[in-house]
């Protein structure tokens, strides 16, 4: 029967209702006014809920509603989880004579909605429906399209639980199983690691973490055969679903996936620790992977310093290797203030050498030592191979053994070395016998001509008693024995023409260290009565060295050849501050030239001393007679040098042939100690007493 359009104009009432209740195990749902006719234009909803873990069985025992296509007019609708499970209208009867149920629904969820709707008019009287619901057990393991458990599903009334095979564990979501494959630490220097169950399929939904931890100084090296790797391949975007990853400190290798290992077959990690992470998802498990690893000693660079030699020599040095590093000649390793020609170094766990701060650097010989009376050129540097030159203060000093030269080279042992002298420093010795100004005036000293000290730079002035001496070295004065007899500390000066006190204050005063009289000298006689002046010679050793210059320089000692034997007629020089024919006291230095004559001339001189007889005087081969009438030395000149020219020398140079000793009468012939006869004694005495006292 069709619907009248006029019926839309009469609206009796419209009811919308919704009912819900706490979860129950069963219940009844009846259409409004059941079993009477249900009202028009009404909508009513029942929210059915049974306890968790149960489904709902909904069945109708009576259904009498207006029939329409697709139940468009009146209907009862069943909805679960937003999905329509059914829509009913019309009349239904039981298909089973033994059961009153005309329609039945089993919902695997614990909630559903029942919605009753009626339109604005019914041309017949319809009584509606009667329905009942009850909680039913649901088999979650089989009743759902989505499997609730990754492995084993176990159903029970009101619920289910998941379980796992042996060696698996249940994740926190209580549904998925994984493998206990983390926490393994490998410390052996060689080993093998594989995925769980290899070569059988690895577990799904797992994260396996392994760690290789080797002793510091070794790096982990991993090797994999391509055929030993089969992991679920990457997706279309290139992302690995299952993956193998290596992480070593700040380096990462991977992730890797696919059939056949896609990475390098040998991985050098440069680290003693390696983390291995294997991660899988829920789909497509393959056979997995197998790898081998070993510890390779960390290498150290072959050269840590130039100019060195290593022992032992090897192509490669690795952790714990020890080498002796020897610097090549001329180089040394310096630490602090200490230098060494070698040191030891150990390859450390970090791939660095111990003692790497040390370097083989050129040996530094340091600032050259100064020398007395000389100087050394300032070198550009003082390192190995550098050359320096020593020189003496010319013209007053010369270099002893000059044939060896003054060149020194910085040697490998850190010393300045001369080719001939080795490490011995050159010695600057005074130039002897060379006056700054030649004495040109031929004049007798007795009442003679004034002279400059530059003409007799070897002249020594003895203050008391007034006498003379000859400087023969930096530490030695030669004089007559009778001058220093009884006087162990004579006062002496050098370098002054005048012996006024104000002049002496500005020149070098010599300090006596020791007086050594010739052992053949006969001591004790009074000079006024002495007639034996044999061996009248003495040495005075000085405490401090004499500084040579234009007014001070030594006279040479005689040589040993016959050329140094004074002969009659040889002209020699004498100087001093002795008495003249006019003055007993002389202030300015005077000098003269005297010829050598025979001892007989001296014997024939008439004796003026009333206390001595002429026949008592002793004449020996240790004496020289020199002078001529009116030209002689006198009191105050004793001990001074009688200087003869050095034979066979172009430039003027003098040696001490004699020392003023004695004479019978001033202004005539005088006796001089013959120095040549005492040459050996002089040298031996100087050698045996070569180190002056420093007191």
Swiss-Prot record:
Residues 22-136, 181-296 form the CUB domain. It comes from Mesocricetus auratus. The active site is at residues 482, 536, 638. PANTHER family: COMPLEMENT C1S SUBCOMPONENT (PTHR24255:SF18), COMPLEMENT COMPONENT 1, S SUBCOMPONENT-RELATED (PTHR24255). GO terms for molecular function: calcium ion binding; identical protein binding; serine-type endopeptidase activity. The modification (3R)-3-hydroxyasparagine is found at residue 155. SUPFAM superfamilies: Complement control module/SCR domain, EGF/Laminin, Spermadhesin, CUB domain, Trypsin-like serine proteases. Residues 298-362, 363-430 form the Sushi domain. It is an enzyme of class 3 (hydrolase). Belongs to the peptidase S1 family. Keywords: Calcium, Disulfide bond, EGF-like domain, Extracellular matrix, Glycoprotein, Hydrolase, Hydroxylation, Protease, Repeat, Secreted, Serine protease, Signal, Sushi. GO terms for cellular component: extracellular space. CDD domains: CCP, CUB, EGF_CA, Tryp_SPc. Disulfide bonds join 71-89, 141-153, 149-162, 164-177, 181-208, 240-257, 300-347, 327-360, 365-410, 392-428, 602-625, 634-666. InterPro entries: CUB_dom, EGF-like_Ca-bd_dom, EGF_Ca-bd_CS, Pept_S1A_C1r/C1S/mannan-bd, Peptidase_S1_PA, Peptidase_S1_PA_chymotrypsin, Peptidase_S1A, Sperma_CUB_dom_sf. This is Calcium-dependent serine proteinase. Glycans are attached at residues 180, 413. The iron and 2-oxoglutarate dependent 3-hydroxylation of aspartate and asparagine is (R) stereospecific within EGF domains. Its EC number is 3.4.21.-. Capable of degrading extracellular matrix proteins. CASP degrades type I and IV collagen and fibronectin in the presence of calcium. It is found in: Secreted, Extracellular space, Extracellular matrix. Residues 137-178 form the EGF-like domain. One of its GO terms (biological process) is proteolysis.
């Amino acid at each position: 029967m069709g619907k009248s359009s006029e019926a839309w104009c009469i609206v009796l009432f419209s009811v919308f209702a919704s009912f819900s209740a706490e979860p129950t195990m069963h219940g009844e749902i009846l259409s409004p006014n059941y079993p009477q006719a249900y009202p028009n234009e009404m909508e009513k909803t029942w929210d059915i809920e049974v306890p968790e873990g149960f489904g709902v069985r909904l069945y109708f025992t009576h259904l009498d509603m207006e029939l329409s296509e697709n139940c468009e007019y009146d209907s009862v609708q069943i909805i679960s989880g937003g999905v329509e499970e059914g829509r009913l209208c019309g009349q239904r009867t039981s298909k089973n004579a033994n059961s009153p149920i005309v329609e039945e629904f089993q919902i695997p969820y614990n909630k559903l909605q029942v919605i009753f709707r009626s339109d604005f008019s019914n041309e017949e009287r319809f009584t509606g429906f009667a329905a009942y619901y009850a909680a039913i057990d649901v088999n979650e393991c089989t009743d759902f399209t989505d499997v609730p458990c990754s492995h084993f599903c176990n159903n029970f009334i009101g619920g289910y639980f998941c379980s796992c095979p042996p060696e698996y564990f249940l994740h926190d979501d209580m549904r998925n199983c994984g493998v206990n494959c983390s926490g393994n630490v490998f410390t052996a220097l060689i080993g093998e690691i594989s995925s769980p169950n290899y070569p059988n399929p690895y577990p799904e939904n797992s994260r396996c973490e392994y760690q290789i931890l080797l002793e510091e100084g070794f790096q982990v090296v991993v090797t994999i055969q391509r055929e030993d790797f089969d992991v679920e391949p990457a997706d279309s975007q290139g992302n690995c679903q299952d993956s193998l990853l290596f992480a070593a400190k700040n380096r990462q290798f991977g992730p890797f996936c696919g059939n056949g290992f896609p990475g390098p077959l040998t991985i050098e990690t440069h680290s003693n620790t390696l983390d291995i992470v294997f991660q899988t998802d829920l789909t497509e498990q393959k056979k997995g992977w197998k790898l081998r690893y070993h510890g390779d000693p960390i290498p150290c660079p072959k050269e840590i310093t130039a100019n060195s030699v290593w022992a032992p020599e090897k192509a490669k040095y690795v952790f714990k290797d020890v080498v002796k590093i020897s610097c090549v000649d001329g180089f040394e390793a310096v630490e602090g203030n200490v230098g060494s020609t070698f040191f030891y170094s150990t390859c450390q766990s970090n791939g660095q050498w111990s003692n790497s701060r040390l370097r083989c650097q050129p040996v530094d010989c340091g600032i050259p030592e100064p020398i007395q009376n000389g100087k050394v050129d300032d070198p550009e540097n003082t390192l190995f191979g550098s050359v320096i030159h020593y020189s003496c203060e010319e013209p007053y000093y010369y270099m002893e053994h000059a044939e060896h030269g003054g060149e020194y080279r910085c040697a490998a042992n850190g010393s300045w070395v001369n080719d001939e002298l080795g490490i011995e420093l050159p010695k600057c010795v005074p130039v002897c016998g060379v006056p700054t100004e030649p004495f040109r005036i031929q004049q007798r000293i007795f009442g003679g001509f004034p002279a400059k000290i530059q003409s007799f730079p070897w002249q020594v002035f003895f203050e008391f008693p007034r006498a003379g001496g000859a400087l023969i070295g930096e530490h030695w004065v030669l004089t007559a024995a009778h001058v220093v007899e009884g006087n162990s500390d004579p006062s002496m000066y050098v370098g002054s023409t005048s012996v006024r006190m104000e002049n002496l204050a500005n020149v070098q005063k010599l300090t006596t260290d020791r007086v050594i009289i010739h052992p053949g000298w006969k001591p004790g006689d009074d000079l006024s009565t002495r007639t034996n002046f044999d061996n009248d010679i003495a040495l005075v050793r000085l405490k401090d060295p004499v500084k040579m210059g234009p007014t001070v320089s030594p006279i040479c000692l005689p040589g040993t050849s016959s050329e140094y034997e004074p002969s009659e007629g040889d002209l020699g020089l004498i100087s001093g501050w002795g008495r003249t024919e006019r003055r007993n006291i002389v202030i300015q230095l005077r000098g003269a030239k005297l010829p050598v004559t025979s001892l007989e001339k001296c014997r024939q001189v008439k004796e003026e001393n009333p206390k001595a007889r002429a026949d008592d005087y002793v004449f020996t081969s240790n004496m020289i007679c020199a002078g001529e009438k009116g030209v002689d030395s006198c009191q105050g000149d004793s001990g001074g040098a009688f200087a003869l020219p050095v034979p066979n020398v172009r430039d003027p140079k003098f040696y001490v042939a004699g020392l003023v000793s004695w004479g019978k009468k001033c202004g005539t012939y005088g006796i001089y100690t013959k120095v040549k006869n005492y040459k050996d004694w002089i040298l031996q005495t100087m050698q045996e007493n070569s180190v002056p006292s420093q007191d």
